[in-house]
Structures are given as C-alpha cells and as structure tokens.
Amino acid sequence: MKSNQFLSVMLLCCVPILGIGQARSFRDFIVAASSPTNPKASETNFKNAGGTDRFLLSEWGKGWALSRGSEIVKEGYAFNFDFERNELYLRKDDEDVMIVADNNSVRRFVIANGTDSARFVKSIAIDKTNKVFFQLMGGSTSGKIALLKLRTSKALPVNKNDYARNVSGDYSTQYRSESVYYFVDSEIGVKGFEKMTRDELLKLFPQHQAIIVKLVTSKKNIDEKTLIAFTNEVNGL
C-alpha cells in the first residue's frame, strides 16, 4: 500500500505541467500505479493478458473521461476498459505507466473503438452502489428509454491435459464473456435480460407496437443491433 501511495505522489509531481482542471482530474483518477498486466503498459500487454475477450481494446485507444467534479480528462491520455474487473485504465502519453481509475471518481467515459465509440455510464437504478460501469448501447440516460449492457469476463481454468495446449506449450489464461442487457425506462423501471423475443418486447412495451413490428420481423431472439435500433427510434434518435 505504501509503495502505491509513493508512486501516486511521484506521479502527482508531474501534474503542474497540465492545466488546472486536467491536473485535478488526473489527481482524482489515480488510485494505483500498478496494473493486472504490466506497469510499463506497452500495447502488447492487453493482447497477452486476454485481448478483447477481457478488454474493450487489444491496445490503447483515444477517448475521454468525465470526473466526479465535472472535469474532462482527454488530451494527452490513452484509455482502455477491463471487463473482468470493471475498471477504467488510463495512460499519460509521455509517461509509460498504467493508471487504474477510481470508479468513485469517474462519472462516465467514452473510448474510441474503430470507427465507432463505446460509451460507459453508471446507473443507480440498476446498481445501488453507483460504482459499476454499464455500456450505453442505445437511447439516452436522460431520454425515454436507455439500453445498457453489463459485460463480464471470467478467466477459464487451464486444462493441463489439453492436447493442443501441450503441443503448443501455450498455457495462457483464456477468458469467456457474458452479457446482461437492461432497459431503463421512466415508466416501467428496470428490466434485465440476457435474451428477448419479439413477443416479450411487445409485452414489455405495448405502447411501441408499431416500432417493434416494423423492426423485428422474426419471432426468434432479437439481436443486439435491432435492440439498439428500437431504443434509438423510441427516443427519436
């Protein structure tokens, strides 16, 4: 613990070169200068530690984070998200050190993912501790309906009797991801689900029957893309 505190103090010595707002945000985010991968945080570490089965990206990406004090950390920082630990990681461009953000100090954040971007928010309607980050898939937290996703990643036990592993000599940890979706609605409250059919969606939102019938043409489980389209159309997005 003392070593982490010392590292945090050393990092803070570099803060004056930033603007006052960014310096305060940077200070708020720092809780440790260690990481589950490697403190030197080269871009290959995420690949070696589970890749996109565990992290949002296999290397650092651009983005921004909004602190509890409504200050934005953006310029000069790289970001990634760990689905196993539900943690946001940052790296200051001119310092090869990974920083673990304090979930209590972060309100929301966005990380660029190819041509798209992943938006993460908190929802006290789902998580009373208000510490867990959910991916905002569709709609808006201030709109009629929001579609949130909680993705979790778990390490799988290594099978030393696996022939393929024995031949390759690769005993690295493998991960499995699972997702739970949530509709957060001002009228119905919160509805969590792993899968949903058209009939279930019609029962949940009978007032939006016209939109559902137009978008959902199969009685099978609705795919994520269609769930997002439904949520956005209800919100007029």
What residues fall within each predicted segment?
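Bacterial Sec-dependent N-terminal signal peptides
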Residues: 1-26, 230
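Detector for intrinsically disordered, low-structure N-terminal pre-sequences
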Residues: 8, 14, 29-30, 105, ...
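Short amphipathic alpha-helical segments, especially helix-boundary/capping motifs
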Residues: 37-39, 186-190, 204-208
